[in-house]
């Protein structure tokens, strides 16, 4: 039986010349849930996610994924274990069609099996709602549809853990609603770590919320529990009426 938590960190710390970006962060990520990581600019979210994904090595502490200590593994090795991290750096090929972009991503695991490769590409396009745009050149997509395509590229790799970094940033209100529905659908098949500033999106999607403050873990719980936490209200959210 799989462990309840797909990922855990212990004492995770990152220092830059004596300045601590993260300090002794003990964090757990429940399997097949959406966990939101929130906090203001400078709270240490990007550094923490960098250490989880392998883009940044910790000064001390450990990261365990599926029970394996991956603290020293680079990002590409973590991808091979089942992590996908999107929106920080786009991997879209603008001159290729939507279908070709997804096919390239799916081919990282399925290039040896032509039928499975084609089936996976079609299934991903259907799941994320881009089947009717499969022949469209990526550079011609709207901003919102490009964001959806970026999700498709991660989904095509069958991630066990999908890290979504500010997926609703820059989207119109209607596009945000569509993204919320999409994330709920994704959570049926994978674990999601969501880095998000939009509190409405967090409230509508997250099963669990973790709050960072000045590099430390400040609070963790359901959205309602975090919202009611006076320290969180003071540090990030204002009064409950403003959330």
Name each model feature, range by range.
Residues 2-243:
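Glycine-rich phosphate-binding loops of nucleotide-dependent enzymes
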